[in-house]
Amino acid sequence: MQFQLFSFALIILNCVDYSHCQASRWRRSKRASYGTNPICKGCLSCSKDNGCLRCQPKLFFFLRREGMRQYGECLQSCPPGYYGVRGPDMNRCSRCRIENCDSCFSRDFCIKCKSGFYSLKGQCFEECPEGFAPLDDTMVCVDGCEVGPWSEWGTCSRNNRTCGFKWGLETRTRQIVKKPAKDTIPCPTIAESRRCKMAIRHCPGGKRTTKKKDKRNKKKKKKLLERAQEQHSVVLATDRSSQ
């Protein structure tokens, strides 16, 4: 009986102000209910409707939006499309401002592009820009093979000769000014040729080919044959008139 009276006296002393007792009891129940809420995990302060308001040190505050509702979360790392910004009061997750970026290091530097996009110097591209090439089968652009301007077209020639033929080939070239980052990256063509008409068809003092001689002889024979046929026709006509 004395023990019960002593316990009751302690309760009375601790709860002299009834309203203060009620407030303490409400705060304890509130912390207990919020503590079991997964939204409040890692929070220093949390709201039932808005989630985390402040995060524990080393965690990042992320404001998640679902339709018209938004609530705060405390995360160890920021989700895709966001990067972590550490501050004196609280660390926050900020949205990447780089187009087609899935994960970024800072506002203007992407470390992982979305699927189907190439990464180059913190930016994302549909294809590697001029002067760059994909590294093997990855979606990363590296320095490609850079070539200089084309030279003028060379002399028209055939079989190392600049005369004696009607048609030949002329060639132009360009030099590699920067080798690619890896040997597996191909370089553009550095030489190309096209058909051309020779300026000098017959070589001075040279002998014509047998093929040309045969062609010329055939023409002469044809002319001689035509002349002989004409003379024969004239003779026949003369004989008929004399008769």
From Swiss-Prot:
Q: Which InterPro entries match?
A: Furin_repeat, Growth_fac_rcpt_cys_sf, R-spondin, Rspo_Fu-CRD_dom, TSP1_rpt, TSP1_rpt_sf, TSP1_spondin_dom
Bias (Basic residues) occurs at 204-224
Q: Does the keyword Glycoprotein apply?
A: yes
Mention one GO biological process in which this protein takes part, according to its record. Answer: dorsal/ventral axis specification
Which residues form the FU repeats?
A: 90-134
Query: What keyword terms does UniProt attach to this protein?
Result: Developmental protein, Disulfide bond, Glycoprotein, Heparin-binding, Secreted, Sensory transduction, Signal, Wnt signaling pathway
Q: Where in the cell is it found?
A: Secreted
Gene Ontology molecular-function annotations:
BMP receptor binding; heparin binding
Q: Where is the signal peptide?
A: 1-21
> What domain of life is recorded for the organism?
Eukaryota
Instruction: Indicate the segments forming the TSP type-1 domain, all copies.
Output: 144-204
- Which residues of this chain are annotated as glycosylation sites? 160
Membrane-spanning intervals of the chain: none
Q: What induces it?
A: By Wnt proteins.
Q: Where is this region: Disordered?
A: 204-243
Q: Which cysteines are joined by disulfide bonds?
A: 40-46, 43-52, 55-74, 78-93, 96-104, 101-110, 113-124, 128-141, 145-187, 156-163, 196-203
PROSITE patterns in alphabetical order: TSP1 (PS50092)
> Which Gene Ontology cellular-component terms appear in the entry?
extracellular space
What role is this protein assigned? Activator of the canonical Wnt signaling pathway by acting as a ligand for lgr4-6 receptors. Upon binding to lgr4-6 (lgr4, lgr5 or lgr6), lgr4-6 associate with phosphorylated lrp6 and frizzled receptors that are activated by extracellular Wnt receptors, triggering the canonical Wnt signaling pathway to increase expression of target genes. Acts both in the canonical Wnt/beta-catenin-dependent pathway and in non-canonical Wnt signaling pathway. Activates neural markers and promotes muscle formation.
* Subunit (UniProt): Binds heparin.
Which family, according to UniProt? Belongs to the R-spondin family.
- Give the domain note: The FU repeat is required for activation and stabilization of beta-catenin.
What name is this protein filed under?
A: R-spondin-2
Organism, scientific name: Xenopus laevis
Q: What is the lineage of its organism?
A: Eukaryota, Metazoa, Chordata, Craniata, Vertebrata
Gene that encodes it: rspo2
